[in-house]
Curated annotation (Swiss-Prot):
Gene Ontology cellular component annotations, sorted alphabetically: extracellular region
Places the protein is found: Secreted
Organism expressing this protein natively: Arthroderma benhamiae (strain ATCC MYA-4681 / CBS 112371)
UniProt-listed Enzyme Commission number(s): 3.4.16.-
Function: Removes acidic, neutral and basic amino acids as well as proline from the C-terminal position.
UniProt-recorded Gene Ontology molecular function terms: serine-type carboxypeptidase activity
Keyword match Kinase: no
Pfam entry (one): Peptidase_S10
UniProt name for this protein: Probable serine carboxypeptidase ARB_06414
GO biological process: proteolysis
Entry annotated with the keyword Cell cycle: no
UniProt keywords, alphabetically: Carboxypeptidase, Glycoprotein, Hydrolase, Protease, Secreted, Signal
Residues carrying a glycan: 284, 377, 440, 448
Active site per the UniProt annotation: 225, 434, 503
Amino acid sequence: MRGLSYFVLALSAIDAAAAASLPFLRSLQHVGRRDPAARNLPNYDFSAIPPVEKRQTASRLNGKTKKYAVDGTKIPEVQFDIGESYAGLMPISTRKDESRELYFWYFPSENPAAKDEITIWLNGGPGCSSLEGLLQENGPFLWQYGTLYPVPNPWSWTKLTNMVWVEQYNPTDDNPSRPVGTGFSQGKPSVRSQEDVATQFLGFFRNFVDTFDLHGKKIYIVGESYAGLYVPYIAHAMFEKKNKRYFNVESTMIFDPSINKDEILTQVPAVPFVEHWKGLFPFNETFTKQIHDMADKCGYSSYMKEHLVYPPKGKLPALPKATPECDVWTAIFDAVSLVNPCFDVYQVATTCPLLYDVLGYPGSFEYLPAGANVYFNRTDVQKAINAPLQKWTECSERPVFVDGKDNSEPSSFTIIPDVIEKSPRTIIAHGDLDYVLISNGTLLSIQNMTWGGAQGFSQEPSKPLFVPYHDRGSLSTLSGAGVLGRHHTERKLTYVELYLTGHMGPQYNPSASYRILEYLLGRIDDLSK
């Protein structure tokens, strides 16, 4: 998910005779090639989950849903059947004159364990399209950076649960010379806070439930980045309704979330982040001293040392008001962008060249090669998925909120603790290569929260996140196995840190994100097994 603005082998010498006696060593010509090897370790078994394209009958097709039906064999550039799905605009109220509508794309699952649930996915921004999540993170087909065509996604969340990707509220623009805005959702700006966003989303979702006969289904709400506000506020609003026929919310999960003030999430942990990934930030001694001096002078160094502790010593004090002289995050971004002009704030291990992205945004900034088109801006694509024929952009540069200001408090202050109390499981996950929002900022936020009768975690997250080994499958959808992170749970809140993972967890670490979803849904009870 984009958003939060547009910002980043050594070989041992071996004696030839000794090498000859070691049959497992490879020649230099063989470096990079993988030999198949048997593993006596836990494995994923996908055999019980039939591919979505094998569906013989449409499970949700009826008179009410027919207008939303998508022909899974006629998605432009997709050379396989994506299966049963429904897409289009749904109004946010039952008013006959309602002009505000949210765009959705709904995929029923073939997994029998999913029959009594629905999972909602929201991207963030604010002002970024959830179709990015569908196409490049966790949908049934993927078209990722630098690839020629869409491919089937073996880690599609539709293999586990019924999924609906919903584009957040987006204002239309009366100026025809400018893009209509993010995604396909329609309406003039009217939201001033997350409470307003939640109210409108619940209006949409009630209509969605009525249309697809999903009454009483357990609801899981998942999102990333600025959805660290959307998800808990929407869940809180659903709990407050006390109406399980329409709003039977079960649990929530947020990836790399915006849950606190920017100073905590970005400025305070910036210099320790650079130190941890020193090889990716090859600064000279002069600049390294400069950013350390900035962090010391602005109180960031002492703040980290004193408050990122387990258990916490008490409520975290407010930081002094931010000044340009204390903007160490931007100083680092500007400096590393000189060394690595393709620096990606969403995944800091990225280097040049910039890869082609069919959504036009392959890193810290927009980029589309000459002659290329943004996929969802194509008329044939829009017709195939029941979208309005209009200009589509992945992220809007125009304000989503009235006057460009979200008047809500950060979700970690009050809303997330309330949601944790009312849910069987709440998960906060964070990629360790994310610079746009830094994992230690999320941990600081958790250590400042009070829920379940205590503040923060009593222990630092340290348990291994284990992903079962699996067949490599297609080279186009490789994903890791083994220990891919660390995790910790206390009082129904689970924190997961994903190793070698950027801002968009399901994009950069699909197998681990799939595993975490299994835990959220209650399909597994231990992330270390």
